[in-house]
Amino acid sequence: MGFGGFNGDFNFRGASDHRPLGSDGFLPSLDTNPFLKNHKSVEALDLCKKLHKMGISCDMSIWTKPEEQFRVDPSEFGARTLHGSSGFDQNLTGASQIHDGFRNFSSVRLQNNNFHGVSPSPGEMRLLGRQDSFNLNGFEEMLALKNHRDFLLDQIHEPIKRPPFLRGNDALISSLMFEGNNRVSQTLAAMEASRGFYPEEDSSLLSPFHEKVSGKLGASYLEDTVLIGQGSYGKMSPKSNNDLVSMVEIYGSVNLMAKDQIGCRVLQKLVEEGTFHEAKVILLAIIDHVVELSMDPFGNYIVQKLFDVSDEEQRTLIVSVLTSNPRELIRICLNTYGTRVVQKMIETVKTKQQIALVKSGLKPGFLALVKDLNGNHVIQSCLQTLGPNDNEFVLEAATKYCAEIAIHRHGCCVLQCCISNSVGLQRERLVAEISRNSLHLSQDPFGNYVVQYLIDQQVSAVKLLVQFRMHYAELATQKFSSHVIEKCLRKYPESRAEIVRELLCVPNFEYLLQDPYANYVIQTALSVTKGPVRAKLVAKVYRYGKLHSSPYCKKIFSKTILKK
């Protein structure tokens, strides 16, 4: 407790009015020493009470306004540790052995110090000595501080050794150890330290990998993994096993490890360079989190690596988990990182069972996928990797939603991929549907690319030209469709006479010559036509020679084109 003052003291009137005193004239305890938090003090009068009884007044300035900031000398006091039992608790048992020596030390030290500029009198020194012998709390506290400091000096360079259950928890809350410029070296150092202190516990850390694996396939994996953990496989690399176990100790689980940049790289290396059974262990550890990892910035790489190195049985397990919920699969496909995993899955599936699972998972979300920045690559991967029969579900949907897909930014790319990867009856149906909508598509910012791609594929001109007939002049004056008409002039020789004849019949032909887009159609017609058809076109152009200075007619009236 702090000293407040008593009636008759010369400085009692100067005390602050805002400091409430107890009934006995003393302040509540101001002692915040952490070492006395759980320490019960015996009921006795403290030094201030004794001084008051002797008629000695204390200067209250030491409580109201310290002259300078109080500092603790590190050489005299230690810091209490918070990890388990400290040296403070362990060394209290030796207090009785140096009790007398420390009491003498405290008294001698007080003799050499001034108390606010006044040296203690012999009577006061005797009182202080009695205080030390009567109240053991102050002595035990100082003794504990001294012993604790000595303990810290002895243990400061010793490595921290914790039981396994604490080590796992510390790893989860100490993720900051991987932040900074030297994360790789810290990780490797931790791996070596763990391997050196706890080599006998490697197999016990593999037990979390065995949970939630159902069916005959899961049972066989479980059996193999238990044998791996017990060291029954001669092919199991001890070094690789230690690496995996050490890293799991740091991160807490393989799932958390896969979400870290460094941890994911270590897992990929273990999967790629380790044994077949090590890949099984890692697969079992993440199989319940494969959907989550597929959409993780780092976790997606380990899932892709497992698709590359797994056997057909393991690959079937991963595919079945990813495709079990079509809604979740579509969500993965639309994700920036998940689309890579699904594309890798499509590229590696081989068996009929695996392909059937992929098709059943993707089919419900076809339209959403083709219109998405990430999802459209999944459909294109199917078209480029799977066979014609397996792509039937894609081509059927593309034919059905042809007009809707073709006018979409990403859908037009998918539709072009469908054209190039279709054969036979499927191709004929798709081409017929695109041709039927070609007049509308050729005027669209994205649909015109589909029509142009169809023309480049040497599709029969009859179906397209039927749609364009009587619309050539109109299409020639539009930004997007003018490219389609130019493509027809270049790729379909049989269409040239019909296109030129329709252009020449326009009442206001001079408007075509001055049009920002139609003038390019006229230039292309002059370049590709021959004979009577070209002669009629040149004669028509010469009638409007006065337009040769027009910015859009300069190229048309150039000697190179007209005299070609």
From Swiss-Prot:
One of its GO terms (molecular function) is RNA binding. InterPro entries: ARM-like (IPR011989), ARM-type_fold (IPR016024), PUM-HD (IPR033133), Pumilio_RNA-bd (IPR033712), Pumilio_RNA-bd_rpt (IPR001313). PROSITE patterns: PUM, PUM_HD. Residues 222-564 form the PUM-HD domain. It comes from the Eukaryota. It is found in: Cytoplasm. GO terms for cellular component: cytoplasm. Keywords: Cytoplasm, Repeat, RNA-binding, Translation regulation. Pumilio repeats lie at residues 249-284, 285-320, 321-359, 361-396, 397-432, 433-469, 470-501, 502-539. The keyword Repeat applies. GO terms for biological process: negative regulation of seed dormancy process; regulation of translation. SMART domains: Pumilio (SM00025). The pumilio repeats mediate the association with RNA by packing together to form a right-handed superhelix that approximates a half donut. The number as well as the specific sequence of the repeats determine the specificity for target mRNAs. Sequence-specific RNA-binding protein that regulates translation and mRNA stability by binding the 3'-UTR of target mRNAs. PANTHER family: PUMILIO HOMOLOG 9-RELATED, RNA BINDING PROTEIN PUMILIO-RELATED. This is Pumilio homolog 9. The lineage of its organism: Eukaryota, Viridiplantae, Streptophyta, Embryophyta, Tracheophyta.
